Regions:
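An alpha-helical support segment within catalytic cores of ATP-dependent transferases
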Residues: 50-104, 115-116
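ATP/Mg2+ or Mg2+-diphosphate-binding catalytic cores
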Residues: 76, 80, 182-218
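Start-of-helix signal in alpha-solenoid helical-repeat scaffolds, especially tetratricopeptide repeats
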Residues: 167, 171-175
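Active-site activation/catalytic loop segments of kinase-like enzymes and analogous catalytic loops
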Residues: 133-161, 174-192, 204
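Pre-DFG segment of protein kinase catalytic domains
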Residues: 101, 120-123
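ATP-binding pocket architecture of kinase catalytic cores
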Residues: 1-57, 68, 72-79
Length: 218
């Protein structure tokens, strides 16, 4: 799945991996031509049965960033939106969280392709136990899939070993936008400048809540 690792020293903070000569990094456009390669990678991860260290808990992540942010959170109607976001916790519990090994951070740039056509998935910093639908939500959000592209990918991914819940994907999209919008506020307090990235993700979370609230899947 990943490139070969030669050195991994936790104490020194050093990691040395194989260098893939002339590798191509995917982007939000090229990733949509690789469904037949990406789906098996995710199926392998999600059906592996491996127990990864740590568990990615979305609602705890929200609380974590809220506690780290020193100033007032600058997003419109944040308190009301937060209540709606946290109301999803019970719904997720009712649906059931399928605890599997996950990559967590499926931005297109974490997929690289060798000149021979082999696809690698890199940057496992956030990998932990979570519901596989989190990974699918991340894949769709980070590369801005259309509904038609989502269904096309799911036709490659869905199987008896890797079932799909479209409702959970919708919920995890909202949670991801909420988390990364808060992450942006925290980082900008530390001096970073992400432009309108944070507010755009927050606004998309709000739209997602409105759409989910009107969905007949609930």
């Amino acid at each position: 799945l990943d490139v070969k690792n030669y050195l991994f020293d936790i104490e020194a903070g050093i990691k040395v991996n194989e260098y893939i000569e002339s590798a191509i990094t995917l982007d939000a456009t090229t990733i949509k031509t690789k469904f037949d390669k990406i789906a098996p990678i995710l199926q392998t991860i999600h059906a592996s049965g491996k127990e990864l260290r740590g568990e990615f808990a979305p609602f705890e992540e929200i609380k974590k960033y809220e506690s780290l942010i020193e100033e007032k959170i600058p997003y419109a109607n944040y308190k009301a939106v937060r209540e709606e976001v946290f109301s999803l916790e019970k719904r997720l519990a009712n649906l059931g969280v399928d605890r599997k090994s996950c990559h967590i951070d499926l931005v297109p740039e974490n997929f690289i392709e060798s000149p021979q056509g082999r696809l690698y998935l890199i940057d496992w910093e956030y990998s932990s136990m979570n519901d596989p639908m989190w990974d699918l939500a991340a894949l769709f959000l980070e590369s801005e899939f259309t509904p038609q592209e989502e269904e096309a990918f799911l036709s490659h991914y869905e199987s008896e070993q890797t079932p799909v819940s479209r409702e959970k994907i919708a919920i995890y999209k909202i949670l991801q936008d909420a988390i990364w919008s808060l992450w942006t506020v925290y980082k900008e307090e530390q001096g970073a400048d992400f432009g309108d990235y944070g507010v755009n993700r927050y606004q998309r979370a709000v739209k997602g809540l409105a759409y989910y609230g009107g969905s007949d899947e609930k």
